[in-house]
Amino acid sequence: MLRTKGFSLIELLVVVAIIGALAAVGTLAYNGYVSGARKTAAQNAMQQIGLMQTEYYSIVGEYYGEASCTPSAASTSAINTNLFDGADSIDVEKYWFCVHEETESGSQVGYVVKACNISGDACGSTNLTLNAKGENNF
């Protein structure tokens, strides 16, 4: 009987199936790492906004903030303009930010930085907050 060198069809199919399974697991793991990295970048940006709030307060005498706050592209742009003077900016892929002013009896007592994960054109399910006292829900 003449024996040819090479792999049988079954052996090739097994190898292709194993490579496919490894690729699927690897892709899911990679997407999880990317999502986690974006969330960490958003947390860092929120802390940077908090630091700029301290500087803004020392110059102006009050915190920057909006009476009502829903994270959007416009509110993120307003933060870049008002807190960072356009010299620096926060630009975290897939996240929008806003700053809400906290008041008691009509006077400003602090702020809350809000961030949301963009899902399409609206905020998704991941919402992060950081207040003037450093309390957060990271």
Region locations from a protein language model:
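A generic fold-level signal
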Residues: T4, A41, G106-Q108
